[in-house]
UniProtKB/Swiss-Prot annotation:
One of its GO terms (biological process) is protoporphyrinogen IX biosynthetic process. PROSITE patterns: AA_TRANSFER_CLASS_3. GO terms for cellular component: cytoplasm. GO terms for molecular function: glutamate-1-semialdehyde 2,1-aminomutase activity; pyridoxal phosphate binding; transaminase activity. It catalyses: (S)-4-amino-5-oxopentanoate = 5-aminolevulinate. The modification N6-(pyridoxal phosphate)lysine is found at K271. Its cofactor is pyridoxal 5'-phosphate. This is Glutamate-1-semialdehyde 2,1-aminomutase. Pathway: Porphyrin-containing compound metabolism; protoporphyrin-IX biosynthesis; 5-aminolevulinate from L-glutamyl-tRNA(Glu): step 2/2; Porphyrin-containing compound metabolism; chlorophyll biosynthesis. Signal peptide: none annotated.
């Protein structure tokens, strides 16, 4: 590995970007605010690798923030897109590809009997919130501290992702009246949820959560937590919603609900199902989804929803994922990676705890365990920033925030895992003092 990179061109491009876009980026975390150093400007990606505009190559553990589960620019996905684009980029009308991808999602995800495609995970969560309220006739919703469900006003309360990265409790411009119906509880705390139901009888439309928190680092559900939420929502006539934008088709073909054996009423999806193109979806029981326009009165629409390119990329990606041994392969690679990272930290006297589920992983530089967002905030963010900068020098691209999960793909081989662990060994050795 090269010990240091020349990133002069990245510096020049980003300097220009600062004059053109707020913070120089189209999404806040990309600005490296929580890790320091120069944001890297990418030129191209392929397989497990990304190349910046200076020609430096990185082993990529962001994967476009989750969609690139088959590896970047998979040849079969590219070929399918090349064929599709010859027929046009968007129809603004029904297309065959919508039917095919819908069938695949319904076949895979236990809770989904009908599905509606949108253009982002945020859109999916906005729409599912409206649907929850309409179906139950109730206004309040419970979310969990550190869980991120997009940047809609109702969800910007104790949120994760970029909100956590920047240390914001909420966002200016969100009226208190908008968030008055958003109730929050610590993740993995069933008693707190029970208390909210007790204090708000017949008023809570549902509970929405990331079944594995990936936007406050990487936090897994304690045994019985998801099952307890299922029981509580059923008992109180409320809906359970899994935000599987991140976990859907990543930790298993049927997502977290298949992995943990807990079936919600509604599910939101994104990332993987678009194969790298903008996409989102929400689905669930027929009796609930039938309320969505034009079948029912709950309005939701989108100019590019269900466009043939995103549908095509999604179809090919799911076909690749359905092949035998896919998740076992990714799971073994990811387990070896996180075990190597933790061993390397321990060898250098650095406190760490972490874990992985299939092709998703994360770690905190603190004493563990981490079960919720408050505990996640004990992470040594300053040390993580130093680690991130050292890893960049050694050609490994981690999420530029301690509050984001990492992702592997089918393209990450033993060689990439070994080189990554070597880079961690070197980086931990540098930052420990």
């Amino acid at each position: 590995m090269t010990d240091i990179f020349n990133i002069t061109h990245s510096e020049e491009v980003f300097s220009s970007a600062l004059k053109l876009m707020p913070g120089g980026v189209s999404s806040p975390v990309r600005a490296f605010k929580s890790v320091g150093g120069q944001p890297i400007v990418f030129d191209r990606v392929k397989g497990p690798f990304a190349w910046d505009v200076d020609g430096n190559r990185y082993i990529d553990y962001i994967g476009s923030w989750g969609p690139a589960i088959c590896g970047h620019a998979h040849p079969e996905v590219i070929t399918a897109l090349q064929e599709a684009i010859e027929k046009g980029t968007s129809f603004g009308a029904p297309c065959v590809q919508e039917n095919k991808l819908a069938e695949m999602v319904i076949d895979a995800v236990p809770s989904v009997e009908m599905v509606r495609f949108v253009n982002s995970g945020t859109e999916a969560c906005m729409a599912v919130l409206r649907l929850m309220r309409a179906f139950t006739g109730r206004d309040k919703v419970i979310k969990f501290d550190g869980c991120y469900h997009g940047h809609a006003d109702m969800f910007l309360v104790k949120a994760g992702s970029g909100v956590a990265t920047l240390g914001l409790p909420d966002s200016p411009g969100v009226p208190r009246t908008t968030t008055a119906n958003t109730l929050t509880a610590p993740y993995n705390d069933l008693e707190a949820v029970k208390k909210l139901f007790s204090e708000n009888p017949d008023a809570i439309s549902g509970v929405i959560l990331e079944p594995i928190v990936g936007n406050a680092g990487f936090i897994t559900p304690e045994p019985g937590f998801l099952e307890g939420l299922r029981e509580l929502t059923t008992e109180n006539g409320s809906l359970l919603v899994f935000d599987e934008v991140m976990t859907g088709f990543r930790i298993s073909y049927g997502g977290a609900q298949e992995k943990f054996g807990v079936t919600p009423d509604l599910t939101t999806l994104g990332k993987v199902i678009g194969g790298g193109l903008p996409v989102g979806a929400y689905g669930g029981r027929k009796e609930i989804m039938s309320m969505v326009a034009p079948s029912g009165p709950v309005y939701q629409a989108g100019t590019l929803s269900g466009n043939p390119l995103a549908m095509t990329a999604g179809i090919k990606t799911l076909e690749l994922l359905k092949q035998e041994g896919t998740y076992e392969k990714m799971g073994l690679a990811t387990s070896r990676l996180i075990e190597g990272i933790m061993q390397s930290a321990e060898n250098n006297g650095i406190a760490i705890n972490g874990g992985s589920v299939s092709a998703m992983f994360g770690f905190f530089l603190c004493e563990g365990p981490v079960r919720n967002f408050e505990e996640a905030k004990t992470n040594n963010s300053e040390l993580f920033g130093k680690l991130h900068r050292e890893m960049i020098k050694r050609g490994v691209y981690l999420a530029p925030s301690p509050f984001e999960a990492g992702f592997t793909s089918l393209a990450h081989s033993e060689e990439e895992i070994d080189r990554t662990i070597e880079a961690f060994d070197q980086s931990f050795s540098v930052i420990k003092n």
